[in-house]
Amino acid sequence: MIRVTLACAAVLALVACSPASETPEPKTETAAASTAALPAAPVFTLVDSDGVQRSLADFRGKTVVIEWTNEGCPYVQKHYSAGAMQALQREATADGVIWLTIISSAPGTQGFVEGEAARAFKAKHDGAWTHLLLDPTGQVGKLYDAKTTPNMRIIDPEGRLVYVGGIDDRPTNKVEDLQGANNFVRAALTDLEAGRPVATPFAQPYGCSIKYPETVEAEA
């Protein structure tokens, strides 16, 4: 199984931040050329909150945002209670972006939902994602090396991973810290829409640990 680890973050950072030579040649590089080395996003299939199978492959040709969430996590609550996450979801989807929100909490752990609770999740949180995907085994979360909630990935229309990490630069659970925060996801989507390489392709994630079965056992 392929795993998207911090090595991918290193590749992303290298593409965005390669040092210039002391005597630089004239720049003729296109955005397409500068993204050629970006890692491919692993394809996966999960069942959504309505019981329908959704594959990442279905959205090839679209920009895709992946968000890991856990409604019991104070760091997630910070973004949802203020409506900030939902506002970003609406902005993105209005521009044609596919937004996949994933719950990787194991059964019996904080954030796990199924059945009617999963079907009611969007209305409960005023969510504006495209699909809510359920990952109770944690297989997809671990495939993407997601360790915290919230945790974000952005995939470009060619299926390349162009952003990995935290949603912003304020690693707190305080709503007031949203004011003036640098939202890396919004900035990355703006770069993509403008045809530019993503200026900040990796940011340190923060939040609650994702409740994989082995994570819960280790914390017990």
Explain the meaning of each model-derived region:
Residues I154-A220:
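Thiol-/selenol-based redox modules, centered on thioredoxin-like
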Residues P24-L56:
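N-terminal "domain-start" segment that seeds a small globular fold
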